[in-house]
Amino acid sequence: MTGTFPVVNFGALERYRVPAADWSGRLTDMDPADREGMPFPRPEAEAATASDIAEIDRMQEILYAQSKHALLVVLQGSDAFKKPTPHELAHDFLWRIHKAVPAAGMIGIFNRSHYEDVLVARVHGLVPPERIEARYDQINRFERHLVENDVTILKFFLHISRKEQRARLQARLDDPTKRWKFNPDDLAERKHWDDYMSAYQTAFERCSSEWAPWFIVPANHKWYRNAVIARVVRSTLEALDLTYPPEMAGLDKIRIE
């Protein structure tokens, strides 16, 4: 398994994986309400999610005990982006990312990631176009370096429609208990919807690799989104051939007084 993405049978969920080469798909043509990958009624899908999470929890303990592999889960969506701080801008764009990569035995989740630097930076012109262009190759090399050091990478784009995003933002305003989630920046970024879709399209084309694939997950239905991600994570962990480390000799003879 060292140095490459594990061989995983994702079954029908393979439809959401962006091929590593010659992707002819268009993000704007993909249905954010699609449910063909796991065509179950909601109760069955939620039961499957609960089962997958329980199995992930079990395997996470073995992952930690074995302390050989790490799993990095990258989540990106169509919400407001956090612009880099002046301190972050003073370093190379991967500086803050590398130090947050999970250690062996750990699972790390990036809620937003190094892809901000080819998304928000591109849309808002924070750096020259030639620097954006260079970053795609830099990201691929960085991710390859991680994989060669036993960090398995899963990247999920949570694909919702513009109409669904509007409904969710409005729901936050309408419900006093959800207003704390509202970010005015979401409204400003929403005006750049088409620009972001174009930036994501390029990122998928340039940075979905055999060693660090992108999955475009239909996310209009949160329960379906959760089911897909849980199943992909579970299937990936199962493919890592996780085992507990060998026990010390003579443990069966030890008696605790």
Language-model features: where?
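Pre-Walker A adenine-sensing motif
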Residues: 57-65
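Pre-Walker A (Motif I) flank of P-loop NTPase domains
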Residues: 67-72, 104-105, 212-213
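Conserved catalytic network of the ASCE P-loop NTPase/AAA+ motor domain
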Residues: 64-66, 86-87, 99-103, 145-151, ...
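Conserved nucleotide-sensing/catalytic segment adjacent to the nucleotide-binding pocket
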Residues: 37-48, 85-137
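Glycine-rich phosphate-binding P-loop
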Residues: 73-83
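Charged, amphipathic alpha-helical linker segments immediately N-terminal to NTP-binding catalytic cores
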Residues: 1-55, 68
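A glycine- and Lys/Arg-enriched "phosphate-lid" helix/loop adjacent to the NTP-binding pocket
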Residues: 120-138, 146-198, 246-252, 256
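NTP-dependent small-molecule kinase module
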Residues: 198-201, 205-257
